[in-house]
Each structure stands twice: as structure tokens, then as C-alpha cells.
Regions:
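Conserved interdomain linker/interface between the two RecA-like ATPase lobes of SF2 helicase motors
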Residues: 2-36, 172, 176-256
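Conserved RecA-like ASCE P-loop NTPase motor core of nucleic-acid helicases/translocases
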Residues: 51-59, 93-95, 253-256
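Conserved nucleotide-binding/hydrolysis micro-motifs of P-loop NTPases
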Residues: 59-63, 98-101, 125-127, 141-144, ...
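Conserved helicase motor "Helicase C" RecA-like lobe of SF1/SF2 P-loop NTPases
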Residues: 61-87
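Conserved motor-coupling elements within RecA-like helicase/translocase cores
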Residues: 69, 83-119
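Flexible beta-alpha connector loops of hexameric P-loop NTPases
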Residues: 93-101, 143-153, 227-233
């Protein structure tokens, strides 16, 4: 399905199947669920190739949503099993500061020992002890939670890209709105390669798909109101807006 929606998505699939470093900037389609489906597809593709996956998400809300999506495709969260000896098992683990120290350390040991190959968490998960040419993904790389205010001021985006480059992995930056860094990296004409930056292949949905998935938007500026022959063009809330709001209230709530 993603192949029919995004350009350059085949390059990402090839990278996940390959053995060399590649970086991507992916612009997910609108919607609270679509980005999770994209990430789940990448995680599944990486795990099928025997590659670990590290997912750095902004807050616990995104982590819980992502865990739910991974479970919907058949992956199990690291948790106690039904065995009588109290063993733990699972396909992915969560690392965050809200966990009890014992639970967090147990998940850390499972990751470092290779028992769990997929990690999702907040900024600190960028240091997850995975080895090999893993998938390193960050969501909304411009959010303030990803910046460290202490020396050496490590940023999650730079750390993940550095790890991917050092281990011939795949780096993916996802956001509904590209960060300045991501936009810079998608222009091969001027971007320079450093340890934490360089060219990234842009992955964007086809125009027709984006138009179909996007909400209908109209800007009621003076030109548009004049075109509609609205006599209340100078009012704080023009008659056209009042009419649209009144009609919308007949079928549901309105956010103003």
C-alpha cells in the first residue's frame, strides 16, 4: 500500500534489506494513525532482515500509540510470560523514565543481550544498546524534548544518524513538518557531509494522495470574501464564516 502512496519508498525498502548506510526524510500523510502504520512497516521490514530497530518518540503518548500499533501487527511487548519460572519475553521493549528502575533495567538487559531487537522510547532511547546495522528512527526531530541541555548537548537526531552511519544502518527522520535540518539535508546541491549530517533521500506522498488525505481548507481573506460577494467583508466574523459554522454545528462540534 505504501508503494502506491509515496515516491522513493522503494529506496527505503532496498536500504532496509541492504548492508550500507542510508538516510531518509519521510513526510507522513496527515492523520494521527498514518505515521504509526509507516513506522510499523519499517520495523517489520527491519526485523525480517534480522536488523534491530530503535525508535525515538517525543512523549509517552506517542510511545503508547506506537506500542499499540506494533501489537496490532503481531509483535509482543516485553513483559512477563505465562511460564511458571517468571520469565520475560517479547519482540519490542519500552525504555523511559516513568518505568520502575527494576523494570527499566530488566528491559535494558534484554536489549543489550539481544533478546529484544526493537526499542521504543523517549530521547534517552537514542543510547539503546543495540548492535549491527540497525534502523534508527526519530519522530518530530525538532521537538524540544530531543535536545539535551547538559554538556555535550547531544541531540537525539544527531546521535541516531551518527550511530546509523557508524554501523551501516538506516536513519529515518519523520515529521508532519520538516525541521530546518531535514529540509537542508534533502537538497543535494548544497548540503555538506559531516558526522551528524549529510544528504538524506526525501520520501513524500504523491500529490494526488496528499490532496485526498488532507482536510479541505479555505482562507477567508479579503480577496476570497470579495469573490464570494460577502457584504460583511470588514466584519470581525464575516457572514460567510457564520454561515459555515452554523451549518457545521448541525452535524457535530466546531472548534473556533
Amino acid at each position: 500500500r505504501l508503494q502506491r502512496q509515496y515516491g522513493n519508498i522503494d529506496l527505503l525498502r532496498t536500504a532496509l534489506e541492504g548492508q550500507r548506510f542510508q538516510a531518509f526524510v519521510l513526510d507522513p500523510l496527515p492523520g494521527s494513525h498514518h505515521w504509526r502504520q509507516c513506522v510499523a512497516w519499517m520495523v517489520a521490514a527491519a526485523l525480517l532482515q534480522g536488523k534491530p530497530a530503535v525508535l525515538v518518540l517525543p512523549t509517552m503518548r506517542e510511545i503508547e500509540d506506537m506500542a499499540e500499533t506494533l501489537q496490532s501487527i503481531g509483535l509482543r511487548c516485553f513483559a512477563p510470560t505465562q511460564s511458571s519460572n517468571g520469565a520475560y519475553g517479547g519482540d519490542f521493549a519500552i525504555l523511559n523514565a516513568q518505568m520502575a528502575p527494576a523494570e527499566r533495567y530488566r528491559a535494558y538487559l534484554a536489549i543489550s543481550g539481544g533478546q529484544v531487537r526493537c526499542v521504543i522510547g523517549t530521547r534517552a532511547a537514542m543510547y539503546a544498546p543495540v548492535d549491527g546495522n540497525a534502523l534508527f528512527l526519530i519522530l518530530d526531530d525538532v521537538c524540544y524534548q530531543d535536545a539535551d541541555g547538559m554538556m555535550p548537548y547531544a541531540n537525539a537526531r544527531g546521535v541516531l544518524r551518527l550511530r546509523a552511519k557508524a554501523h551501516n544502518g538506516v536513519f529515518v527522520a519523520m515529521a508532519n513538518a520538516r525541521s530546518v535540518q531535514s529540509q537542508w539535508e534533502t537538497d543535494a546541491a548544497h548540503v555538506g557531509a559531516t558526522q551528524v549530517s549529510g544528504f538524506s533521500t526525501p520520501i513524500h506522498a504523491f500529490p494526488a494522495v496528499t490532496k485526498e488525505a488532507s482536510p479541505w481548507i479555505r482562507w477567508l481573506n479579503r480577496d476570497e470574501l470579495a469573490r464570494l460577494a460577502d457584504s460583511t467583508i470588514g466584519a470581525r466574523v464575516p457572514h460567510t464564516a457564520v454561515r459555515v459554522l452554523s451549518k457545521a454545528l448541525e452535524s457535530g462540534p466546531v472548534l473556533l
